[in-house]
């Protein structure tokens, strides 16, 4: 039985917990072998075909010859799963500053104080963790938390995990320096990162954070926005199922889930370039700057001669190496990005998951509201209002919230995350 974990996160959670109990780790794709009653007796992530066949044959033999053993093991796993979801209420007292500092000290042991983020690979952006670190700094005045937050936000936005041409963050970095991403780009990641960078701008007044938040919104609108037969106007719902928008000329009122990592049979093909391609796309002056700005290498800075466009140097270092003034640098860099984007537009695009998920759209609703507030942009509040109206009219049916909308059909009762995210977005 194949289950879409985005449609049924409740089922995914049960078998992911089982996988972590059995193996000590989790991930996707998630595969589980269960008894007829649904209790898991084996779980893991990716298996090569031959290994998967061997596992199935071995477990089938155990179930045929020693069924009691299989049922006993499944029962023990079920007991542990039940214990994971059992919460004991405790009376807690007031939270003191010393406790907050102790919690951050524990967290700090698992942080990378050179590259930002967690001290391991792969590296996920983890916006909720950075929100906590910002709150910790504001509550306690802890300067180390402030320094780490700045470090992480800058390193992430300059790394290959961030798409400097089209905006938007990829799912995670495969290395510990934010360089080589898994190129999938998802709505719920970018929504939370928009909120984070917009809030960080209001806190610090750092122009980079405003730029990143705006570029991520631009990405969501251009790449993930859906349109229907009729744009949302005057509180009326879109008619029919959403379809993908091409460009900026449509009013979006709902958003798809993700862009795939692959195109043309290669992960990242849409986003990476050979040196020869860039020499063809750009003028000599533009290429000279791009080579410094994005660390372009003759044989590629990544795999198979391709370059990931990352930005290891600070702007002042780029100015020093290029010999340009700030007045020359900014328009030239803008021209470079525009030309690369036009070239990308001629490529085969990654496939687009166009299902609209309630909780993910609600996170983007919150992101637009945060951007409207922290960046002082009324255009974002108008987009947020349109999205909220669409969600009410589409996801709220017969006094319950539904989770998935695709091809004109809204289905699957909402989960706690759908209600919680929608309430927060509103």
Region roles according to the model:
Residues 1-363, 367, 371-374:
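Replace the tail clause
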Residues 356-362, 366-426:
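Long, K/E/R/D-enriched contiguous segments that form extended
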């Amino acid at each position: 039985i194949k289950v879409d974990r985005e449609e049924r996160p409740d089922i995914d959670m049960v078998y992911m917990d089982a996988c972590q109990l059995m193996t000590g780790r989790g991930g996707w794709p998630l595969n589980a072998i269960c008894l007829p009653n649904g209790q898991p007796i084996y779980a893991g992530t990716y298996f090569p075909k031959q290994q998967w066949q061997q596992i199935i044959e071995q477990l089938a033999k155990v179930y045929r010859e020693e069924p009691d053993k299989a049922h006993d093991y499944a029962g023990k796993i079920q007991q542990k799963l039940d214990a994971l979801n059992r919460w004991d209420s405790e009376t807690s007292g007031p939270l003191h500053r010393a406790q907050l500092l102790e919690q951050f000290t524990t967290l700090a042991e698992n942080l990378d104080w050179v590259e930002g983020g967690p001290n391991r690979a792969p590296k996920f952006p983890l916006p909720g963790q950075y929100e906590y670190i910002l709150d910790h700094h504001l509550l306690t005045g802890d300067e180390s938390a402030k320094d780490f937050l700045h470090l992480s936000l800058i390193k992430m936005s300059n790394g290959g995990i961030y798409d400097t041409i089209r905006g938007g963050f990829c799912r995670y970095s495969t290395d510990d320096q934010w360089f080589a991403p898994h190129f999938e780009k998802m709505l719920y990641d970018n929504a939370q990162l928009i909120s984070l960078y917009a809030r960080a701008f209001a806190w610090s007044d750092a122009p980079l954070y405003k730029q990143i938040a705006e570029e991520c919104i631009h990405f969501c609108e251009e790449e993930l926005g859906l349109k229907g037969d009729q744009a949302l106007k005057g509180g009326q719902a879109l008619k029919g199922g959403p379809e993908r928008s091409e460009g900026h000329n449509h009013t979006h009122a709902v958003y798809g889930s993700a862009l795939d990592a692959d195109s043309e049979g290669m992960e990242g093909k849409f986003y990476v370039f050979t040196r020869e391609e860039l020499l063809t796309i750009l003028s000599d002056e533009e290429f000279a700057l791009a080579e410094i700005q994005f660390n372009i290498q003759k044989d590629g800075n990544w795999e198979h001669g391709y370059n990931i466009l990352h930005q290891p140097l600070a702007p002042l270092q780029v100015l020093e190496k290029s010999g340009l003034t700030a007045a020359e640098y900014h328009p030239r860099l803008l021209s470079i990005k525009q030309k690369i984007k036009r070239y990308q537009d001629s490529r085969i695009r990654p496939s687009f998951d166009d299902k609209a998920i309630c909780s993910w759209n609600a996170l983007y609703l919150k992101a637009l509201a945060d951007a409207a507030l922290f960046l002082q942009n009324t255009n974002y509040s108008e987009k947020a209002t349109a999205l909220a109206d669409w969600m009410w009219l589409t996801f709220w049916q017969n006094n319950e919230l539904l989770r998935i909308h695709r091809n004109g059909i809204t289905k699957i009762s909402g989960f706690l995350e759908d209600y919680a995210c929608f309430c927060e977005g509103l």
